[in-house]
């Protein structure tokens, strides 16, 4: 048994904040109430005074690198990193080696996760065989085996007819298509956002329309096919406008952006910081503001981390040779609190919706809720704690965080999943 004392419970934007104790028995919340009787001999007692308790988080877009790239990350190390950041459900992308493009590979990911992961790992299947953009993968069989979405993330499905067929199949199998929107005819060879910083650094730029033209295409295809299109890692103001327009049309489109896109700009790459090389690239302050407004209005539905671990040897090279991507599990909540709550006046309940209710709804799961009889999936957060992101404190096998050296506010101190304590008082136990 676990007893959390003096909890300030935040379930969502619309629920009132409740101050109470939480009693956890086995994997469920047994009781929520005032002054629950303590029994130190039979229960673990956690004092949450001055902290908030909220449902644990879900990430619908991450990379665990297994199989094939275990030197960067694997299912066990990635899951531990996710747990450290408060995530107890994560959806891993199929760009592994071999790719997750068939029933057997989906089964493998699920088997490995059951074997080594302390949290829930859900596989995303590929749209096309081998992620080659030439032939549709086994969408129906992968859905049967447990894939929760399909995506060729890391690559764009450039063939519009193939993408249309993928959307048609996804509709028939009731599975969302997660679209990586990048016109490679426009972005090929690009390193950073096309603009002021690309000009002064001499690095080849990626025009913003490389993202928005594919978003426009996919919205029209989703409208025609009446399919669920999910647009991932949105980075430009034009993209936000297009998604807003699509929702006004009644298109079944959802979208996410990432912590680094709502907090940082292209100026992070001044000095050729390869940890700031991500795809899509960091954009301008105008884009940051448009993304924040999109989150506020509900145009962008949720936050994903796009946790993309890379070995130090793939980052400690010339900028144009460096791999694209940043890790994100362990900093996600703190970045959102620092840049959305502290700096832009978001309600903390809105962050719960962006990290729990909305991503789970997109992939067809009910939200984690702190109510009697529900599964005990929760985090305890110190909203006042300030901490610096340091390489030596990162749990992930790779350390390529764009937030290294930055000071963030709020810290996920304790994580409980299905009644098991994965992290307590900042110490990971899984």
UniProtKB/Swiss-Prot annotation:
It catalyses: (S)-dihydroorotate + H2O = N-carbamoyl-L-aspartate + H(+). Zn(2+) 2 binds at residues 153, 180, 233. Its cofactor is Zn(2+). GO terms for biological process: 'de novo' UMP biosynthetic process; purine nucleobase catabolic process. PROSITE patterns: DIHYDROOROTASE_2. One of its GO terms (molecular function) is allantoinase activity. It comes from the Bacteria. InterPro entries: Amidohydro-rel (IPR006680), DHOase (IPR004722), DHOase/Allantoinase_Hydrolase (IPR050138), Dihydroorotase_CS (IPR002195), Metal-dep_hydrolase_composite (IPR011059), Metal_Hydrolase (IPR032466). Pfam families: Amidohydro_1 (PF01979). Binds 2 Zn(2+) ions per subunit. Pathway: Pyrimidine metabolism; UMP biosynthesis via de novo pathway; (S)-dihydroorotate from bicarbonate: step 3/3. The active site is at residue 306. SUPFAM superfamilies: Composite domain of metallo-dependent hydrolases (SSF51338), Metallo-dependent hydrolases (SSF51556). Its EC number is 3.5.2.3. GO terms for cellular component: cytoplasm. Substrate binds at residues 63-65, 95, 279, 310. Coiled coil: none annotated. Zn(2+) 1 binds at residues 61, 63, 153, 306. Keywords: Hydrolase, Metal-binding, Pyrimidine biosynthesis, Zinc. Belongs to the metallo-dependent hydrolases superfamily. DHOase family. Class I DHOase subfamily. NCBIfam families: pyrC_multi. Catalyzes the reversible cyclization of carbamoyl aspartate to dihydroorotate. This is Dihydroorotase. It comes from Caldicellulosiruptor saccharolyticus (strain ATCC 43494 / DSM 8903 / Tp8T 6331). The lineage of its organism: Bacteria, Bacillati, Bacillota, Bacillota incertae sedis, Caldicellulosiruptorales.
